[in-house]
Amino acid sequence: MTTQVVNVIGAGLAGSEAAYQIAKRGVQVRLYEMRPVRQTPAHHTDKFAELVCSNSLRANTLTNAVGVIKEEMRLMDSVIIRAADECSVPAGGALAVDRHEFAAKVTEYVKNHPNVTVMNEEITEIPEGPTIIATGPLTSPDLSAQLKELTGEDYFYFYDAAAPIVEKDSIDMNKVYLKSRYDKGEAAYLNCPMTEEEFDRFYEALIAAETVPLKEFEKEIFFEGCMPVEVMASRGRQTLVFGPMKPVGLEDPKTGKTPYAVVQLRQDDAAGTLYNIVGFQTHLKWGPQKEVLQLIPGLENAEIVRYGVMHRNTFINSPNLLRPTYQYKQRDDLFFAGQMTGVEGYVESAASGLLAGINAARLVKGEEPVVLPPVTAMGSMANYITATNAKNFQPMNANFGLFAPLEKKIKKKAERNEAYATRALETIRNFVNI
């Protein structure tokens, strides 16, 4: 076993996964996590891999690229996906988790590994020696300054937003119904139907509600996948009806008709006592937020246990700075992982940590770092963040559009996606022992 130690900075999804992958390969890890010594504006605990936005890791089927990346990670012994599978809650065709159990499970698996030493302290300078920086969207100011100096480039700022969570007991169950869209999977969502009149009243209140002011020096650049509901509404009333309040496939069993609009609630904990409001990430002040949410049928007396909040997100210009191994181009033993690389989403962040961790371990053992082919979901993400146009670089979720093209064109989308998935999983099996 090598005597060299790899520093991993940040015990979020990417950092926890990276530390585990390094440790299981017989390499010592120093895992630095500043919480609880210093908290961030969005975290509430000292647990690893705390989910600060939704509790859903999105689609769990192979007809979706994020489902494929999960299956690749299962084959590669991902600690994040293992913990998620063990802490899952009902969510139709998605993989959602009890966020508290999930974070506790990841913490247990990583912290208890004999090759992992946890250091609860803030890192303000980039260490010498093999290092993975996985400090995420809320990198502390001191380390951010160091990274700016290192890269010679400014960061890009945007906001991720978290949706409110309500107590199930406070929901008027006479006004809502249990159903998944198009009846896919088990009936996993509580649906709050709206008439056009109810929607109009809600919409007018939403666009008039007061938001928390942004700081002058921060530019508003929202990632489309986690955009505040009031920002979507400001683009026009139909944006909501065709977005998070889309009613298609959600016929009301009481009337047999499709409502004008629907607000969906998704189970947030294993006990089924908490529900989050799907797609309702928001930056509204808490008073106006409560008033607006209580205009939703069934939520008139809702007890809000967590208000929607927003936090800054930060990412580097990876096409200029990184290789598809997640190595920094100017320093072979420095790696980046997680959302700061421009991969967007919980699963994608963990996947980047998995690959960065494997490559950091290989580096200190004198082995060549691995580049996963872009026919795989993980390889396509690494390829996207390092080979796309640097000038217009934006965060991206896993999607089949990033995969290398199929050899033969397939017209039907379902068959095409199945072909992408089959090829990806056949390929990734060649890498399970790296």
Curated annotation (Swiss-Prot):
Origin: domain of life: Bacteria
Reactions catalysed: uridine(54) in tRNA + (6R)-5,10-methylene-5,6,7,8-tetrahydrofolate + NADH + H(+) = 5-methyluridine(54) in tRNA + (6S)-5,6,7,8-tetrahydrofolate + NAD(+); uridine(54) in tRNA + (6R)-5,10-methylene-5,6,7,8-tetrahydrofolate + NADPH + H(+) = 5-methyluridine(54) in tRNA + (6S)-5,6,7,8-tetrahydrofolate + NADP(+)
A GO term for molecular function: flavin adenine dinucleotide binding
Subcellular location: Cytoplasm
Cofactor(s) listed in the protein's UniProt record: FAD
PANTHER family the UniProt entry points to: GLUCOSE INHIBITED DIVISION PROTEIN A (PTHR11806), METHYLENETETRAHYDROFOLATE--TRNA-(URACIL-5-)-METHYLTRANSFERASE TRMFO (PTHR11806:SF2)
Similarity comment: family membership: Belongs to the MnmG family. TrmFO subfamily.
Protein name from the UniProt record: Methylenetetrahydrofolate--tRNA-(uracil-5-)-methyltransferase TrmFO
Organism the protein comes from: Bacillus cereus (strain AH820)
Organism lineage string: Bacteria, Bacillati, Bacillota, Bacilli, Bacillales
